[in-house]
């Protein structure tokens, strides 16, 4: 019996999953999309933290905070902020921002959003951030689609910039062709015609 208990204990320890990186968000920060996937409420723990994958992460968050406008309380919902950062295995990160009380402070945040990403030792972690601006009703937004559209637009820009660099390659190819002898040029042209798509 003692051996069985010991064996079960060892198996439990060995089969326990490795700890993943965790990100704890300030309570007013709402995670919307993590690494291209919609964040379901059950993914968020009681202390407003979510699990991250090791390595590169992309997170879309919004700020949902009560502010004062003309002496009345009102809910302010920000445009989504899309952050990209690296998380090491077992990292414990926190994401915060300076809370605001008035609608004027909220509008100032909207124009120039600032958030802070720190590790468990309080050291700031590098990240990049863009604000996804879209008009219309904020309550009916498809955050997952907006992030996908943004990522596609960024990929298209990268493709365009690589295409823009290709004239230099073409110029080099032309120069190399001109340096070939007449026979080598004819051989190259025959090869090119055979492989023409």
From Swiss-Prot:
Q: Tell me where the signal peptide lies.
A: 1-20
Q: What's the domain of life for this entry?
A: Bacteria
User: Which pairs of Cys residues are joined through disulfide bonds in the record?
Assistant: none
Q: Which UniProt keywords apply?
A: Signal
Coiled-coil spans in chain: none
Q: Name one Pfam family in it.
A: DUF2057
Q: Which InterPro entries match?
A: UPF0319 (IPR018635)
Q: Which PANTHER family match?
A: UPF0319 PROTEIN YCCT
Q: Which family does the record assign?
A: Belongs to the UPF0319 family.
Q: Which protein is depicted?
A: UPF0319 protein VP0761
Q: Mind giving the lineage of the organism this protein is from?
A: Bacteria, Pseudomonadati, Pseudomonadota, Gammaproteobacteria, Vibrionales
């Amino acid at each position: 019996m003692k051996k069985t208990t010991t064996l079960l204990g060892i198996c439990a320890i060995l089969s326990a999953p490795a700890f993943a990186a965790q990100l704890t968000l300030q309570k007013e920060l709402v995670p919307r999309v993590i690494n291209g996937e919609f964040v379901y409420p059950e993914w968020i723990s009681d202390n407003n933290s979510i699990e991250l994958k090791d390595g590169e992460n992309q997170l879309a968050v919004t700020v949902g905070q009560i502010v004062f406008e003309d002496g009345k309380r009102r809910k302010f919902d920000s445009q989504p902020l899309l952050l990209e950062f690296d998380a090491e295995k077992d990292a414990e990160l926190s994401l915060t921002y300076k809370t605001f009380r008035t609608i004027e402070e909220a509008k100032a945040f909207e124009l120039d959003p600032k958030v802070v990403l720190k590790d468990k030792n309080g050291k700031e972690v590098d990240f990049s951030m863009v604000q996804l601006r879209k008009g219309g009703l904020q309550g009916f937004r498809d955050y997952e689609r907006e992030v996908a559209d943004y990522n596609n637009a960024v990929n298209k820009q990268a493709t365009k910039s690589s295409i823009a660099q290709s004239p230099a390659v073409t110029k080099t190819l032309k120069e190399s062709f001109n340096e070939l002898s007449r026979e080598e040029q004819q051989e190259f042209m025959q090869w090119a015609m055979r492989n023409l798509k």
